[in-house]
């Protein structure tokens, strides 16, 4: 089969559960790390900045039996290649598209967070006949008003967007991973889990994608390129009958009250479920609740 050509087998972390396997999928001469379990209709888990497929491990293993589970490391993250490219959303999307095509995935259920939502929804809007359903939370979904974000984050993001200053803070001094990332949890991450997220980025060069994350985040209409990129999915969200599930968390971070209200009005065939306390990397904070809600939703839509 097409998906078995030129793939490098690896061993996944044990937290993905018994029977999981890992391999690299080639894309434009680079490698996209993938963890897989099971068979049947694919369920694809896409993370965001600065994490990896590891973020999904607790949910992934709790959904064994629902289909062919596939958790990806986006280009520039985790165990995937970290090329010296411009990490625009369009460039990153090319690798996401290539991964879907390399595995020839159809009848796909997408489970998305952070920039994973931006890429997954963009792909869905251009491949509607290949999409079965979409679940998402804490998404990069549309422009965010700075008044809805913490003043500390707005100030830090503005500094990271300054040429030179962002490179020093994120790439040279590694302070995004050591200072900012740990701040996004109600309960501190266990040291071993923090190491799992930090280890894939040992050098300044390897952290280029991480810097692009805050620089690409759309706040007060900037950058306009991100706003335009996200708009590509709006018509599909507004018109598609594809089942959609949005999970909410308190206090949350990217899913502001304004964006939640926009979603309620704009997104067709949308269910919304409250999933408890969490900031942004909610797969670490509410894995059991997320898995339970996804399990019930997947069972429900399978009967439709």
UniProtKB/Swiss-Prot annotation:
Catalytic residues, chain numbering: 114 (nucleophile), 138 (proton donor), 280 (proton acceptor)
A Pfam entry, by short name: Abhydrolase_1
UniProtKB keywords: Hydrolase, Plasmid
Listed SUPFAM superfamilies: alpha/beta-Hydrolases
Top class in the EC scheme: hydrolase
Domain of life of the organism encoding this protein: Bacteria
Gene Ontology MF, one: haloalkane dehalogenase activity
EC number(s) on file: 3.8.1.5
Catalytic activity entry: 1-haloalkane + H2O = a halide anion + a primary alcohol + H(+)
Residues of the AB hydrolase-1 domain: 42-154
Function: Catalyzes hydrolytic cleavage of carbon-halogen bonds in halogenated aliphatic compounds, leading to the formation of the corresponding primary alcohols, halide ions and protons.
Quaternary structure and interacting proteins, as annotated: Monomer.
Family: Belongs to the haloalkane dehalogenase family. Type 2 subfamily.
Entry protein name: Haloalkane dehalogenase
Upper lineage: Bacteria, Pseudomonadati, Pseudomonadota, Alphaproteobacteria, Hyphomicrobiales
Name of the encoding gene: dhaA
